């Protein structure tokens, strides 16, 4: 947690952005895995963390705009809880830690919300993503759980996005620390990547490194020699010579700030032939994004410039042909890069994705595309100092997609399918770093950059 002044300042800033009514921010509850007392590792709602600070289940906060007051709701523990869990701070104590003087039992939340509704006041809430909170909102507001998400306050969503998008110095420091853990995770994976090792073993080591810092991974670890599957959580394979291992993994600090990095390395520690060729193309794409990323530029334009680097590189390999700009405009490159360049990052690894990418990654100026590949770009809007985003180009050879496009004669003016056929067993490469937008451009987050050049990767893998 940060100091109480941080949370007071954030709630006041939110109050200033919402015209009237009350703002309801629900925390999360424990989620049973297979019976009530055996729960998944608890993860608090990120907006509740941002405005109310506490990573404990079963709480809610209310910001009353006209009254200028904040309320904290939760239940104190009883003796049975103390026997099993030990002494716990009271709700009043938790509220005071984040600068709130008025705390109430959770049962009184319905009275406060009901009174506001009876007075004709607006009750602002964010889109719920957990079913228990959908049901709670039905109980509080009378809106059916099945449709309550449609009634989330757009005014509140936009206000929260405005505040959470620009990271404070204390947040940047936490992200840097999360990236330091990410450095340990990824360099461990590089050292362990050898023929005969099971993917699951390495993935388990990475998860253990994150846990050893009192935190957890920021998402389910992706570690596979089948990098052509973008989010491959199957760790069942034995690493084979001649393949490449893609590791997309991140850590989450005890404060819940995240890291998210991807590296792709050769099994056995030495890039060979076409591995080196494709890797250098992806690295050039990655470096192009770093070169031009700065405040004021739209990230969709950065994405498209990176795609031009990809097309030129694939032309040089004989896999693509024709005019580079026309190929990108047509979307022919999406055969190899069917996702976007990056996304926001912070308290969520895909920051604020629960609020809707239409508000987080886009705005009234920049709207999402419907073109295949470009439609998957999560972040297109104009960049501002203080944003933390990912830079994650890739190049994938997806057999099913290649077969489909070839059969449908897709983009034959730009794609050399005969040459592409020879790469169907290649897999995929992705390289990802977390980037802070600064006043002058951008910088990597974390103390040290994870090895990324061919020389750096081969050196650490063969130490």
For the regions a language model picked out, list residue spans one by one.
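Active-site neighborhoods and metal-handling regions in enzymes and metal-associated proteins
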Residues: 1-463
